[in-house]
Amino acid sequence: CTWYDFAREIVKLAGHNCEVRPCRSNERPTIAKRPHYSVLSKTKVVNKTRTTLRPWQKALGEVIEEIMNKRNILITGGAGFIGSHVARLFATKYPHYNIVILDKLTYAGNRENISDILPLENVVFIEGDITDTMLVDEIFVKHSIDGVLHLAAESHVDRSISAPMVFAHNNIIGTITLLEAARKAWSNSYEGKRFHHISTDEVYGALSLDGGAFSETNRYEPHSPYSASKASSDHFVRAYHDTYGLPTIITNCSNNYGEYQYPEKLIPLFIYNIVNRRPLPVYGTGSNVRDWLYVGDHALALDKVFHEGKCGDTYNIGGNNEWTNIDLVHRLIEIVDEELGDEAGKSLELITYVEDRAGHDLRYAIDSSKLKQELCWQPQMSFDEGLRRTVRWYLANTEWAERSLAKE
Protein backbone atom coordinates (compact mmCIF):
# COMPACT_ATOMS: atom_id res chain seq x y z
CA CYS A 1 0.00 0.00 0.00
CA THR A 2 1.04 3.63 -0.37
CA TRP A 3 1.89 5.83 2.60
CA TYR A 4 -1.35 7.68 2.00
CA ASP A 5 -3.21 4.36 2.39
CA PHE A 6 -1.22 3.59 5.52
CA ALA A 7 -2.01 6.98 7.04
CA ARG A 8 -5.72 6.54 6.20
CA GLU A 9 -5.79 3.21 8.02
CA ILE A 10 -4.13 4.70 11.10
CA VAL A 11 -6.65 7.55 11.10
CA LYS A 12 -9.52 5.08 10.70
CA LEU A 13 -8.29 2.96 13.60
CA ALA A 14 -8.07 6.08 15.75
CA GLY A 15 -11.77 6.68 15.12
CA HIS A 16 -11.37 10.08 13.53
CA ASN A 17 -13.41 11.39 10.63
CA CYS A 18 -10.51 12.78 8.67
CA GLU A 19 -9.28 13.04 5.12
CA VAL A 20 -5.73 12.09 4.19
CA ARG A 21 -4.54 13.70 0.96
CA PRO A 22 -1.51 15.36 -0.64
CA CYS A 23 -0.67 18.86 0.53
CA ARG A 24 -1.82 21.82 -1.49
CA SER A 25 0.75 24.42 -2.45
CA ASN A 26 -0.17 26.73 0.45
CA GLU A 27 -0.31 24.07 3.21
CA ARG A 28 2.18 22.73 5.74
CA PRO A 29 2.46 18.93 5.94
CA THR A 30 1.04 17.11 8.94
CA ILE A 31 4.27 15.16 9.36
CA ALA A 32 7.21 17.53 9.37
CA LYS A 33 9.95 16.76 6.91
CA ARG A 34 12.93 14.99 8.52
CA PRO A 35 16.56 15.29 7.36
CA HIS A 36 16.68 11.83 5.77
CA TYR A 37 13.02 10.80 5.49
CA SER A 38 10.83 12.83 3.17
CA VAL A 39 8.21 10.28 2.08
CA LEU A 40 5.49 11.91 4.17
CA SER A 41 6.68 15.46 3.69
CA LYS A 42 3.73 16.16 1.37
CA THR A 43 0.99 14.39 3.34
CA LYS A 44 -1.89 16.37 4.83
CA VAL A 45 -4.44 15.08 7.35
CA VAL A 46 -7.59 17.23 7.40
CA ASN A 47 -10.07 16.97 10.29
CA LYS A 48 -13.62 17.22 8.95
CA THR A 49 -15.41 17.66 12.26
CA ARG A 50 -13.09 19.60 14.60
CA THR A 51 -10.96 22.68 14.35
CA THR A 52 -7.99 21.13 16.11
CA LEU A 53 -6.54 17.62 16.01
CA ARG A 54 -3.29 18.14 17.84
CA PRO A 55 -3.57 15.36 20.49
CA TRP A 56 -4.18 12.50 18.07
CA GLN A 57 -2.17 14.19 15.35
CA LYS A 58 0.85 14.10 17.61
CA ALA A 59 0.26 10.40 18.32
CA LEU A 60 -0.14 9.69 14.62
CA GLY A 61 3.04 11.55 13.88
CA GLU A 62 4.95 9.59 16.51
CA VAL A 63 3.70 6.25 15.16
CA ILE A 64 4.48 7.04 11.55
CA GLU A 65 7.81 8.69 12.31
CA GLU A 66 8.93 5.68 14.37
CA ILE A 67 8.13 3.41 11.45
CA MET A 68 9.76 5.80 8.99
CA ASN A 69 12.84 6.13 11.21
CA LYS A 70 13.29 2.40 11.68
CA ARG A 71 16.91 1.69 10.82
CA ASN A 72 19.29 -1.23 10.51
CA ILE A 73 22.59 -0.16 12.03
CA LEU A 74 25.89 -2.03 11.82
CA ILE A 75 28.28 -1.26 14.68
CA THR A 76 31.75 -2.69 14.11
CA GLY A 77 33.89 -3.28 17.17
CA GLY A 78 30.73 -3.17 19.24
CA ALA A 79 32.11 -5.50 21.91
CA GLY A 80 35.17 -3.33 22.47
CA PHE A 81 35.67 -0.38 24.79
CA ILE A 82 34.08 2.55 22.97
CA GLY A 83 31.99 0.31 20.72
CA SER A 84 30.20 -1.34 23.63
CA HIS A 85 29.12 2.06 24.98
CA VAL A 86 27.87 3.11 21.55
CA ALA A 87 26.03 -0.19 21.01
CA ARG A 88 24.36 0.09 24.43
CA LEU A 89 23.30 3.69 23.78
CA PHE A 90 21.81 2.96 20.36
CA ALA A 91 20.11 -0.30 21.40
CA THR A 92 18.37 1.31 24.39
CA LYS A 93 17.75 4.85 23.12
CA TYR A 94 16.40 3.64 19.77
CA PRO A 95 14.45 0.42 20.46
CA HIS A 96 12.94 0.67 16.95
CA TYR A 97 16.43 0.35 15.44
CA ASN A 98 17.85 -3.06 14.60
CA ILE A 99 21.41 -3.11 15.91
CA VAL A 100 23.89 -5.54 14.34
CA ILE A 101 27.15 -5.79 16.28
CA LEU A 102 30.15 -7.19 14.40
CA ASP A 103 33.23 -7.95 16.47
CA LYS A 104 36.21 -10.25 15.99
CA LEU A 105 36.55 -10.68 19.78
CA THR A 106 40.30 -10.13 19.85
CA TYR A 107 42.00 -9.69 23.21
CA ALA A 108 40.32 -6.27 23.59
CA GLY A 109 36.82 -7.37 22.53
CA ASN A 110 34.61 -9.08 25.07
CA ARG A 111 31.02 -10.33 24.96
CA GLU A 112 30.79 -9.48 28.67
CA ASN A 113 30.99 -5.81 27.69
CA ILE A 114 27.56 -6.05 26.04
CA SER A 115 25.99 -8.90 28.02
CA ASP A 116 23.21 -6.60 29.23
CA ILE A 117 21.99 -5.78 25.71
CA LEU A 118 22.52 -9.12 23.96
CA PRO A 119 19.09 -10.44 25.12
CA LEU A 120 17.30 -7.45 23.54
CA GLU A 121 15.12 -8.27 20.54
CA ASN A 122 16.63 -5.48 18.47
CA VAL A 123 20.25 -6.64 18.95
CA VAL A 124 22.11 -9.21 16.85
CA PHE A 125 25.72 -10.16 17.63
CA ILE A 126 28.01 -11.60 14.97
CA GLU A 127 31.52 -12.77 15.74
CA GLY A 128 33.56 -12.02 12.66
CA ASP A 129 36.34 -10.08 10.97
CA ILE A 130 35.76 -6.80 9.13
CA THR A 131 38.34 -7.90 6.53
CA ASP A 132 36.18 -10.92 5.61
CA THR A 133 34.61 -9.65 2.38
CA MET A 134 32.04 -12.43 2.03
CA LEU A 135 30.86 -12.06 5.62
CA VAL A 136 30.60 -8.27 5.47
CA ASP A 137 28.73 -8.37 2.14
CA GLU A 138 26.35 -10.96 3.57
CA ILE A 139 25.65 -8.83 6.64
CA PHE A 140 24.78 -5.79 4.54
CA VAL A 141 22.35 -7.78 2.40
CA LYS A 142 20.84 -10.09 5.02
CA HIS A 143 20.23 -7.32 7.57
CA SER A 144 19.46 -4.52 5.07
CA ILE A 145 22.08 -2.31 6.67
CA ASP A 146 21.44 1.39 6.06
CA GLY A 147 23.78 2.89 8.65
CA VAL A 148 27.30 2.07 9.84
CA LEU A 149 29.24 3.17 12.88
CA HIS A 150 32.74 1.85 12.23
CA LEU A 151 34.71 1.55 15.47
CA ALA A 152 36.59 -1.73 14.94
CA ALA A 153 40.33 -1.04 15.00
CA GLU A 154 43.65 -2.02 16.47
CA SER A 155 44.42 0.96 18.69
CA HIS A 156 47.43 0.39 20.96
CA VAL A 157 50.44 2.43 19.84
CA ASP A 158 53.05 0.16 21.45
CA ARG A 159 51.58 -2.89 19.72
CA SER A 160 51.61 -1.04 16.39
CA ILE A 161 55.34 -0.45 16.74
CA SER A 162 56.01 -4.17 17.16
CA ALA A 163 53.38 -5.38 14.64
CA PRO A 164 52.71 -2.68 12.02
CA MET A 165 51.40 -5.13 9.40
CA VAL A 166 48.57 -6.21 11.70
CA PHE A 167 47.50 -2.59 12.09
CA ALA A 168 47.74 -1.91 8.36
CA HIS A 169 45.65 -4.98 7.53
CA ASN A 170 42.92 -4.54 10.11
CA ASN A 171 42.61 -0.75 10.12
CA ILE A 172 43.09 -0.01 6.43
CA ILE A 173 41.91 -3.14 4.60
CA GLY A 174 39.08 -3.58 7.12
CA THR A 175 37.82 -0.06 6.46
CA ILE A 176 38.02 -0.50 2.67
CA THR A 177 36.12 -3.80 2.96
CA LEU A 178 33.29 -2.03 4.78
CA LEU A 179 33.28 0.90 2.35
CA GLU A 180 33.04 -1.46 -0.62
CA ALA A 181 30.23 -3.44 1.00
CA ALA A 182 28.30 -0.23 1.65
CA ARG A 183 28.89 1.06 -1.88
CA LYS A 184 27.61 -2.18 -3.43
CA ALA A 185 24.66 -2.64 -1.08
CA TRP A 186 23.54 0.98 -1.43
CA SER A 187 24.15 1.27 -5.18
CA ASN A 188 20.46 1.81 -5.95
CA SER A 189 20.15 4.83 -3.67
CA TYR A 190 22.20 6.59 -1.01
CA GLU A 191 19.11 8.30 0.42
CA GLY A 192 18.79 7.68 4.15
CA LYS A 193 22.18 5.94 4.30
CA ARG A 194 25.19 6.91 6.40
CA PHE A 195 28.71 5.56 6.94
CA HIS A 196 30.24 7.02 10.12
CA HIS A 197 33.96 6.36 10.53
CA ILE A 198 35.34 6.85 14.05
CA SER A 199 38.98 7.94 14.13
CA THR A 200 41.58 9.49 16.43
CA ASP A 201 43.29 12.81 17.10
CA GLU A 202 46.65 11.07 16.66
CA VAL A 203 46.35 11.41 12.87
CA TYR A 204 47.18 15.11 13.26
CA GLY A 205 50.59 14.45 14.80
CA ALA A 206 52.03 16.37 17.76
CA LEU A 207 51.57 19.84 19.19
CA SER A 208 53.98 22.00 21.14
CA LEU A 209 53.03 22.81 24.72
CA ASP A 210 51.76 26.23 23.62
CA GLY A 211 50.60 25.24 20.14
CA GLY A 212 46.85 25.66 20.41
CA ALA A 213 44.61 22.71 19.48
CA PHE A 214 43.89 20.59 16.41
CA SER A 215 40.98 21.71 14.25
CA GLU A 216 39.31 19.80 11.43
CA THR A 217 41.43 21.70 8.89
CA ASN A 218 44.80 20.64 10.28
CA ARG A 219 46.93 18.59 7.92
CA TYR A 220 47.67 14.97 8.82
CA GLU A 221 51.13 14.17 10.25
CA PRO A 222 50.93 10.70 11.84
CA HIS A 223 54.04 9.53 13.70
CA SER A 224 53.27 5.92 14.66
CA PRO A 225 52.14 2.89 12.66
CA TYR A 226 48.83 3.10 14.53
CA SER A 227 48.15 6.73 13.65
CA ALA A 228 49.38 6.16 10.09
CA SER A 229 46.90 3.30 9.66
CA LYS A 230 44.06 5.45 10.97
CA ALA A 231 45.09 8.38 8.79
CA SER A 232 45.06 6.10 5.75
CA SER A 233 41.61 4.76 6.61
CA ASP A 234 40.35 8.34 7.04
CA HIS A 235 41.62 9.19 3.55
CA PHE A 236 39.88 6.16 2.06
CA VAL A 237 36.61 7.21 3.68
CA ARG A 238 36.95 10.68 2.15
CA ALA A 239 37.92 9.18 -1.20
CA TYR A 240 34.75 7.07 -1.26
CA HIS A 241 32.70 10.17 -0.57
CA ASP A 242 34.45 12.25 -3.23
CA THR A 243 34.64 9.48 -5.86
CA TYR A 244 31.41 7.55 -5.39
CA GLY A 245 29.28 10.01 -3.44
CA LEU A 246 29.08 7.58 -0.51
CA PRO A 247 27.41 9.40 2.42
CA THR A 248 30.34 9.29 4.83
CA ILE A 249 31.24 11.24 7.93
CA ILE A 250 34.39 11.16 10.08
CA THR A 251 34.96 11.97 13.73
CA ASN A 252 38.36 12.32 15.40
CA CYS A 253 38.40 12.02 19.17
CA SER A 254 40.88 12.55 21.99
CA ASN A 255 41.89 9.95 24.61
CA ASN A 256 38.88 8.11 26.03
CA TYR A 257 38.58 6.70 29.53
CA GLY A 258 35.83 4.86 31.37
CA GLU A 259 34.32 1.46 32.02
CA TYR A 260 35.16 -1.65 29.94
CA GLN A 261 38.53 -0.42 28.65
CA TYR A 262 41.00 -3.26 28.28
CA PRO A 263 43.72 -2.87 30.95
CA GLU A 264 46.57 -2.04 28.60
CA LYS A 265 45.83 1.69 28.38
CA LEU A 266 47.11 4.05 31.07
CA ILE A 267 44.11 4.51 33.34
CA PRO A 268 42.80 0.92 33.62
CA LEU A 269 46.34 -0.51 33.63
CA PHE A 270 47.45 1.73 36.47
CA ILE A 271 44.31 1.03 38.51
CA TYR A 272 44.98 -2.69 38.08
CA ASN A 273 48.66 -2.28 38.98
CA ILE A 274 47.94 -0.21 42.08
CA VAL A 275 45.50 -2.83 43.35
CA ASN A 276 48.08 -5.57 42.73
CA ARG A 277 51.05 -3.50 43.98
CA ARG A 278 52.83 -3.57 40.63
CA PRO A 279 55.03 -0.86 39.08
CA LEU A 280 53.43 2.12 37.35
CA PRO A 281 55.62 2.64 34.25
CA VAL A 282 55.77 6.28 33.15
CA TYR A 283 57.41 7.06 29.81
CA GLY A 284 60.26 9.59 29.91
CA THR A 285 59.59 12.34 32.43
CA GLY A 286 55.81 12.04 32.22
CA SER A 287 55.55 15.49 30.64
CA ASN A 288 53.54 14.36 27.60
CA VAL A 289 50.10 15.97 27.50
CA ARG A 290 46.82 14.32 26.56
CA ASP A 291 43.23 15.55 26.34
CA TRP A 292 40.83 13.19 28.15
CA LEU A 293 37.20 12.49 27.26
CA TYR A 294 34.77 10.30 29.20
CA VAL A 295 33.59 7.45 26.98
CA GLY A 296 29.92 8.13 27.73
CA ASP A 297 30.29 11.68 26.43
CA HIS A 298 32.00 10.33 23.33
CA ALA A 299 29.10 7.93 22.70
CA LEU A 300 26.62 10.81 22.96
CA ALA A 301 28.69 12.84 20.52
CA LEU A 302 28.72 9.96 18.02
CA ASP A 303 24.95 9.68 18.35
CA LYS A 304 24.64 13.40 17.62
CA VAL A 305 26.97 13.34 14.62
CA PHE A 306 25.51 10.15 13.15
CA HIS A 307 21.99 11.58 13.15
CA GLU A 308 22.61 15.28 12.55
CA GLY A 309 26.09 15.70 11.08
CA LYS A 310 26.67 16.75 7.48
CA CYS A 311 27.79 14.02 5.10
CA GLY A 312 31.30 14.58 3.80
CA ASP A 313 32.28 16.52 6.91
CA THR A 314 34.72 15.83 9.74
CA TYR A 315 34.03 16.65 13.39
CA ASN A 316 36.57 16.74 16.23
CA ILE A 317 35.43 15.40 19.61
CA GLY A 318 37.49 16.49 22.60
CA GLY A 319 37.17 16.78 26.34
CA ASN A 320 38.79 20.22 26.78
CA ASN A 321 40.67 18.52 29.58
CA GLU A 322 44.46 18.41 29.22
CA TRP A 323 46.70 16.64 31.72
CA THR A 324 50.37 15.74 31.73
CA ASN A 325 50.81 12.00 32.16
CA ILE A 326 52.58 12.37 35.50
CA ASP A 327 49.91 14.70 36.92
CA LEU A 328 47.25 12.22 35.84
CA VAL A 329 49.12 9.37 37.53
CA HIS A 330 49.33 11.38 40.76
CA ARG A 331 45.60 12.14 40.68
CA LEU A 332 44.79 8.52 39.90
CA ILE A 333 46.90 7.37 42.85
CA GLU A 334 45.06 9.79 45.15
CA ILE A 335 41.65 8.45 44.13
CA VAL A 336 42.57 4.74 44.15
CA ASP A 337 44.33 4.96 47.51
CA GLU A 338 41.33 6.80 48.95
CA GLU A 339 38.84 4.27 47.53
CA LEU A 340 40.92 1.38 48.89
CA GLY A 341 41.10 3.01 52.32
CA ASP A 342 44.89 3.24 52.13
CA GLU A 343 47.08 6.01 53.46
CA ALA A 344 47.19 9.00 51.12
CA GLY A 345 50.10 8.72 48.72
CA LYS A 346 50.87 5.12 49.59
CA SER A 347 51.09 4.09 45.93
CA LEU A 348 53.44 6.90 44.86
CA GLU A 349 56.29 4.47 45.50
CA LEU A 350 55.04 2.36 42.58
CA ILE A 351 55.87 5.04 39.99
CA THR A 352 58.71 3.85 37.76
CA TYR A 353 60.15 6.05 35.04
CA VAL A 354 61.03 4.08 31.91
CA GLU A 355 62.65 4.88 28.57
CA ASP A 356 60.40 6.93 26.34
CA ARG A 357 58.81 5.07 23.45
CA ALA A 358 59.71 5.77 19.84
CA GLY A 359 57.67 8.49 18.16
CA HIS A 360 55.99 9.53 21.41
CA ASP A 361 54.04 12.70 20.53
CA LEU A 362 54.49 15.47 23.07
CA ARG A 363 50.95 16.82 23.16
CA TYR A 364 47.48 16.25 21.73
CA ALA A 365 44.63 18.72 22.07
CA ILE A 366 41.33 18.84 20.21
CA ASP A 367 39.28 21.89 19.25
CA SER A 368 35.61 20.79 19.36
CA SER A 369 34.12 24.21 18.64
CA LYS A 370 32.68 23.09 15.28
CA LEU A 371 30.74 20.29 16.97
CA LYS A 372 29.57 22.64 19.70
CA GLN A 373 28.47 25.39 17.32
CA GLU A 374 26.85 23.26 14.61
CA LEU A 375 25.37 20.38 16.62
CA CYS A 376 25.18 21.85 20.15
CA TRP A 377 27.33 19.14 21.75
CA GLN A 378 29.79 19.50 24.59
CA PRO A 379 31.07 17.05 27.23
CA GLN A 380 28.93 16.74 30.34
CA MET A 381 31.10 14.65 32.66
CA SER A 382 33.69 16.47 34.76
CA PHE A 383 37.07 14.75 34.73
CA ASP A 384 37.20 14.23 38.48
CA GLU A 385 33.74 12.68 38.59
CA GLY A 386 34.43 10.54 35.54
CA LEU A 387 37.78 9.38 36.87
CA ARG A 388 36.32 8.46 40.25
CA ARG A 389 33.43 6.64 38.58
CA THR A 390 35.94 4.74 36.44
CA VAL A 391 38.08 3.80 39.44
CA ARG A 392 35.07 2.52 41.35
CA TRP A 393 33.95 0.42 38.39
CA TYR A 394 37.34 -1.27 38.02
CA LEU A 395 37.62 -1.88 41.75
CA ALA A 396 34.18 -3.50 41.69
CA ASN A 397 35.00 -5.54 38.57
CA THR A 398 38.44 -6.97 39.26
CA GLU A 399 37.31 -10.39 37.97
CA TRP A 400 36.37 -8.80 34.63
CA ALA A 401 39.91 -7.44 34.36
CA GLU A 402 41.41 -10.82 35.25
CA ARG A 403 39.29 -12.61 32.66
CA SER A 404 40.12 -10.01 30.03
CA LEU A 405 43.85 -10.29 30.64
CA ALA A 406 43.63 -14.09 30.58
CA LYS A 407 42.45 -13.96 26.95
CA GLU A 408 45.94 -13.09 25.68
Q: For each predicted feature, which ranges?
A:
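Short, hinge-like loop/turn segments at secondary-structure boundaries
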Residues: K12, Y37-V39, I117-L120, F167, ...
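N-terminal Rossmann-like NAD(P)+-binding domain of SDR-like oxidoreductases, especially those catalyzing
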Residues: M68-N256, G296, F306, N325, ...
